Amino acid sequence: MPSTDSIPKSNFDAIPDVIQAFKNGEFVVVLDDPSRENEADLIIAAESVTTEQMAFMVRHSSGLICAPLTPERTTALDLPQMVTHNADPRGTAYTVSVDAEHPSTTTGISAHDRALACRMLAAPDAQPSHFRRPGHVFPLRAVAGGVRARRGHTEAGVELCRLAGKRPVAVISEIVDDGQEVEGRAVRAAPGMLRGDECVAFARRWGLKVCTIEDMIAHVEKTEGKLETNGSG
């Protein structure tokens, strides 16, 4: 199975370049550890994500649009955990799902509606009453300490927002390989997830910066120091 272990470091972009692209409102591709999920997410800042960018994200990802945000933000927006006892293998902290409570929102599933919900999650004046529950965007509660505390895409999204000076809400979704068409049949052959160098190739195809969470941790530790412990959940 392809993994980041087999990819030369030179194939990845420098973290300052990734941060700058993120600051510019671009997608970045972020890979986690091969011993963890061994997957890559498209990540973008929620505050400026457009309908067109959301459409791209839905097309090239699992379609499950998540919005990592800080613990303080989930509290301020009254976003409790989705379940009392989280059985997710990685402890991904899903809150209740939301749509934007807005005149232009229809069913909540369109690219327009989901982009709007994400922007509203990041809006400085956002209030709990600005959202319908349940909805079609899935906020994720990040742990305090960012990627130094937990090596997940949830924390990577919030960390990128912090490093780029953005509002502390990101938008993420796993990148997939949707397989090949089968002529005359309503199926696709050999679907799966993009992994390892396939993710780098995807980033290059679309002109996106690409990095690993491992490199992000190294950058933050070099510039800001280490935490007492480094989580892996």
Swiss-Prot record:
It is an enzyme of class 4 (lyase). Its cofactor is Mg(2+); Mn(2+). Its EC number is 4.1.99.12. Mg(2+) 2 binds at E37, H153. Mn(2+) 2 binds at E37, H153. Binds 2 divalent metal cations per subunit. Magnesium or manganese. GO terms for molecular function: 3,4-dihydroxy-2-butanone-4-phosphate synthase activity; metal ion binding. GO terms for biological process: riboflavin biosynthetic process. The modification S-glutathionyl cysteine is found at C66. The record marks H136, E174 as: Essential for catalytic activity. S-glutathionylation is reversible and dependent on a glutaredoxin. It catalyses: D-ribulose 5-phosphate = (2S)-2-hydroxy-3-oxobutyl phosphate + formate + H(+). D-ribulose 5-phosphate binds at D41, T92, R150, R151, G152, H153, T154. Keywords: Glutathionylation, Lyase, Magnesium, Manganese, Metal-binding, Riboflavin biosynthesis. One of its GO terms (cellular component) is mitochondrial intermembrane space. InterPro entries: DHBP_synth_RibB-like_a/b_dom, DHBP_synthase_RibB. It comes from the Eukaryota. Catalyzes the conversion of D-ribulose 5-phosphate to formate and 3,4-dihydroxy-2-butanone 4-phosphate. Homodimer. This is 3,4-dihydroxy-2-butanone 4-phosphate synthase. It comes from Pyricularia oryzae (strain 70-15 / ATCC MYA-4617 / FGSC 8958) (Rice blast fungus). The gene is RIB3.
